[in-house]
Amino acid sequence: MNGYGSPYLYMGGPVSQPPRAPLQRTPKCARCRNHGVLSWLKGHKRYCRFKDCTCEKCILIIERQRVMAAQVALRRQQANESLESLIPDSLRALPGPPPPGDAAAAAPQPPPTSQPSQPPPPQRPAAELAAAAALRWATEPQPGALQAQLAKPDLTEERLGDGSSADNTETFSDKDTDQRSSPDVVKSKGCFTPESPEVVSVDEGGYAVQKNGGTSESRPDSPKYHGEQNHLLIEGPSGTVSLPFSLKANRPPLEVLKKIFPNQKPTVLELILKGCGGDLVSAVEVLLSSRSSASAADRTSAEPESLVLPSNGHIFEHTLSSYPISSSKWSVGSAFRVPDTLRFSADSSNVVPNPLAVPLQHPFPQPPRYPLMLRNTLARNQSSPFLPNDVTLWNTMTLQQQYQLRSQYVSPFPGSSPSVFRSSPVLPTRAPEDPRISIPDDGCPIVSKQSLYTEDDYDERSDSSDSRILNTSS
């Protein structure tokens, strides 16, 4: 035990010294190791003492290096050739495959197999066969490679085991088979539409030559490609519409809507599509649900009491509970018709018999007696928080223009209590200078009402319908 270190190896070091991290393994020269010498490999190849040795172990190392170099060159050449033959001319302008340098780096390198000590002559023909196969595959044209891959949806069962490429086939790892059997790869092989310009990856391209010798008939018994699944079914409240998959290929949604609903006007279809935010499925659901407006109108006209105003504040819940609950927006009813809950019965003398059913001049002779309490958030109850209804679609702008309502609420209380709603910004009442509500009944004396707003408050508010809609929606 001196200051220069102990010649012995102690397993347990002192407690105060932290344990050292294991050093990274540095590569050593294999030929020198065969002869019992440890040499660092970096910068050693030119000066190795055993570089010209022809013993059995050194020849085995030479042959192993040749086989690995031939495999790497073969895989690189296969990737380049198969990609050039697989990409059609229509997809050449799209973003191309990664460069072959990245492809060779991404391809998994075969691990060095530990072979027993044996004479090299059986190893030499395998390397020559691999190089000859690479040259043969590079020179042969492959016109049917694309058709063979398009006709096979299941790629995992189409591996060939030729004797010439046996050692090449064994070197592919499990990552390639998982990547080939994934549904995304099957989809990109199955249809080369402009919506799916996925280029075949490099690892799959290496298999194009091997799959070329297999059978190229399509597989109708595959569970993913049944004949009845060539159409996309969209369900609505009044029926279903089947969309063929050919409509989805590089076609704008407005054209698809014109194909499905030829009896609708293009402007109406465009408005519905804009209202749905460009979502084709939501627009189809809106158009499907608008078909049921006639039957809903007949059902509503059979009920004389179509507008019921309960006093507990839950407005229209009894009529809206019959709608089906769906999570998609605008799935029930059309935005271009009056909701069924707001249709007035036809036996009243002052109702125009048109689809909008707008009252003429005075549907309510005294609005303070019969307040129309409309909410913009009718679906915000705990039982069904996402209940779609027509009142939320048919916004309060039309109601404000027709019924001259300032906001969501007209106060049913007399004008002698203005301080009740004075501080509430959500419940403003309108000024009483409207000639509509100044017509009293014959038996009711006219009572002068106190104005709830001063002129300054009234001037500060904006009278545009857009700002009122923003206020009510907030």
Curated annotation (Swiss-Prot):
GO terms for cellular component: nucleus. Signal peptide: none annotated. PROSITE patterns: DM_1, DM_2. Its main location: nucleus. GO terms for molecular function: DNA binding; DNA-binding transcription factor activity, RNA polymerase II-specific; metal ion binding; RNA polymerase II cis-regulatory region sequence-specific DNA binding. The keyword Plastid does not apply. Residues 415-428 have a biased composition (Low complexity). One of its GO terms (biological process) is ventral spinal cord interneuron specification. Expressed in the spinal cord, in a small population of neurons located in the ventral horn and around the central canal. Residues 108-124 have a biased composition (Pro residues). It is found in: Nucleus. InterPro entries: DM_DNA-bd (IPR001275), DM_DNA-bd_sf (IPR036407), DMA (IPR005173), DMRT (IPR026607), UBA-like_sf (IPR009060). Residues 89-130, 157-228, 415-474 are annotated as: Disordered. Keywords: Developmental protein, Differentiation, DNA-binding, Metal-binding, Nucleus, Sexual differentiation, Transcription, Transcription regulation, Zinc. Residues 251-286 form the DMA domain. Transmembrane segments: none annotated. DMRT3 is a marker for a subset of spinal cord neurons (dI6). Belongs to the DMRT family. DMA domain interacts with ubiquitin. This is Doublesex and mab-3 related transcription factor 3.
